């Protein structure tokens, strides 16, 4: 059980490569990643464009950034 498939972890594990935060306290952070067909599992407000495949963005406001999606796969 050491290998986890990339496709399941990409869509389900909350992660973000393009995260922006305000300088307020607490910070207001937004993930600007575009994902195909769905948002990550922790996303409460997911907006998808009506395209094939759908381009989805998570519009949640959090006070932190999720771990980077691409670094996840290499260092575990």
UniProtKB/Swiss-Prot annotation:
The family this protein is said to belong to: Belongs to the Bowman-Birk serine protease inhibitor family.
Pfam family, any one: Bowman-Birk_leg
Keywords assigned: Disulfide bond, Protease inhibitor, Serine protease inhibitor
GO cellular component: extracellular region
UniProt entry tagged with the keyword Chloroplast: no
Name of the protein: Bowman-Birk type proteinase inhibitor DE-4
Disulfide bond sites: 15-69, 16-31, 19-65, 21-29, 39-46, 43-58, 48-56
Site, Reactive bond for chymotrypsin: residue positions: 50-51
Naturally occurring in which organism (per UniProt): Macrotyloma axillare
Record site feature (Reactive bond for trypsin), residues: 23-24
InterPro entries: Bowman-Birk_prot_inh (IPR035995), Prot_inh_BBI (IPR000877)
GO molecular function, one term: serine-type endopeptidase inhibitor activity
High-level lineage: Eukaryota, Viridiplantae, Streptophyta, Embryophyta, Tracheophyta
UniProt xrefs under PROSITE patterns: BOWMAN_BIRK
């Amino acid at each position: 059980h050491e290998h986890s498939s990339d496709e399941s972890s990409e869509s389900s594990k909350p992660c973000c490569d393009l995260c922006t935060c305000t300088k307020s306290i607490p910070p207001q952070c937004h993930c600007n990643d575009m994902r195909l067909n769905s948002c990550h599992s922790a996303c409460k407000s997911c907006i998808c464009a009506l395209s094939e495949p759908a381009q989805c963005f998570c519009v949640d406001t959090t006070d932190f950034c999720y771990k980077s999606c691409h670094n996840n796969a290499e260092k575990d």
